[in-house]
């Protein structure tokens, strides 16, 4: 099988986005350009969501309460990704609201220490995601909650791709600047994959309204966040990409809950 196939791009995307053990041969001869491989970010997200959904479903089957099932799934996602996106969300919150100048905000975002804004933001997002998953379990069942995790993890990385493409780099020499930006064709491919996952994971539980809700919420929130990034630091960084993924994930789950 060709290393530059969509499967190869998915495995290399998983290598960047997660800590899952992966066959080394896929990283030897293929195109290791992250902006090109990024077309498979939604597929990598779907794999992570599938594994987290399996944790949620199995926890429910051994009679754990919905909140415990949701928290275990969230913990599984964080463990698989090394809390990559949560770290970006926390750093973004500390930087944006802990300083008054763009340069100082960027300096704070590079600091590995967690501040008050980061801690509060992570508590809110983890709590909100757990509450949404718990509600889906209560209203539609654990199977649909597991499916929703697949959809939200895939689609949120489609949103992250669009966010990455649309905004200029705010930190010369930073991660997102050093690897470049995805081309429009990559974004379109990633969006199509993410949309397909939304159709097949949300509509069975919440109908077309859940799909519309998810798209409207995610688009609106990411657009607002993009404007905030421009105002605060003049563009995007690796941290804000992680924050965009977290925002998109919560938006998709909220869209489904609103339709149930």
From Swiss-Prot:
It is found in: Cell inner membrane. Pathway: Cofactor biosynthesis; adenosylcobalamin biosynthesis; adenosylcobalamin from cob(II)yrinate a,c-diamide: step 7/7. Keywords: Cell inner membrane, Cell membrane, Cobalamin biosynthesis, Magnesium, Membrane, Transferase, Transmembrane, Transmembrane helix. It catalyses: alpha-ribazole + adenosylcob(III)inamide-GDP = adenosylcob(III)alamin + GMP + H(+); alpha-ribazole 5'-phosphate + adenosylcob(III)inamide-GDP = adenosylcob(III)alamin 5'-phosphate + GMP + H(+). It comes from the Bacteria. The chain crosses the membrane at residues 40-60, 64-84, 117-137, 192-212, 214-234, 240-260. Joins adenosylcobinamide-GDP and alpha-ribazole to generate adenosylcobalamin (Ado-cobalamin). Also synthesizes adenosylcobalamin 5'-phosphate from adenosylcobinamide-GDP and alpha-ribazole 5'-phosphate. Belongs to the CobS family. This is Adenosylcobinamide-GDP ribazoletransferase. It comes from Brucella anthropi (strain ATCC 49188 / DSM 6882 / CCUG 24695 / JCM 21032 / LMG 3331 / NBRC 15819 / NCTC 12168 / Alc 37) (Ochrobactrum anthropi). The gene is cobS.
